[in-house]
């Protein structure tokens, strides 16, 4: 199935990875170009990309699946979890650290319970143990009914168990 935007461009392309947001962001009627300048990788191969223009942190699994986006840039970086001028990223265990060059501060982000569930489910799935990850994916869907990754994980679990019709249903929900 192909989906197109009003301009005629295909929006659901499966042959490429979508890193971060669109090329341009808009803030207070001004357009800015995205700039993924810094990366760090944790011990399990999950990686974090820092967009220094928009102040966002993009969290990916080892297979390049986007897991979460957090942080932001509000101009002065005075709101919790936002930055004025993010200049570095570091990952240590279950924490992500961002250095703000203008404010001279380091912000520490801790993994949430939901993030921990996504991380564990994705680790199990990437190891090929789809059925073992099923319970975690079900919990994720119960917390976020819009989790495409959760539906994809359940599709793999049902496929692994030979439940092909159910697998197809979950794959459709996951837009896979």
Which role fits each region the language model picked out?
Residues 6-35, 63-87, 123-124:
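Gly/Pro-rich loop segments of beta-rich domains
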């Amino acid at each position: 199935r192909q989906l197109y935007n009003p301009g005629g461009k295909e929006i659901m392309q499966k042959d490429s990875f979508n890193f971060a947001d669109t090329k341009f962001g808009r803030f207070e009627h001004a357009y800015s170009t995205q700039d993924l300048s810094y990366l760090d990788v944790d011990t399990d191969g999950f990686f974090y990309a820092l967009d220094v223009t928009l102040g966002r942190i993009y969290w990916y699994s080892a297979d390049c699946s986007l897991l979460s986006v957090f942080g932001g840039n509000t101009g002065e970086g005075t709101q919790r979890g936002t930055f004025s001028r993010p200049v570095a990223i570091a990952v240590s265990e279950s924490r992500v650290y961002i250095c703000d060059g203008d404010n001279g501060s380091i912000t520490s982000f801790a993994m949430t319970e939901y993030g921990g569930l996504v991380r564990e489910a994705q680790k199990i799935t990437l190891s090929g143990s789809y059925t073992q990850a099923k319970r975690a994916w079900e919990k994720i869907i119960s917390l976020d009914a819009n989790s495409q990754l959760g539906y994809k994980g359940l599709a793999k679990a049902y496929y692994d168990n030979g439940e092909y019709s159910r697998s197809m249903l979950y794959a459709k929900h996951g837009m896979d």
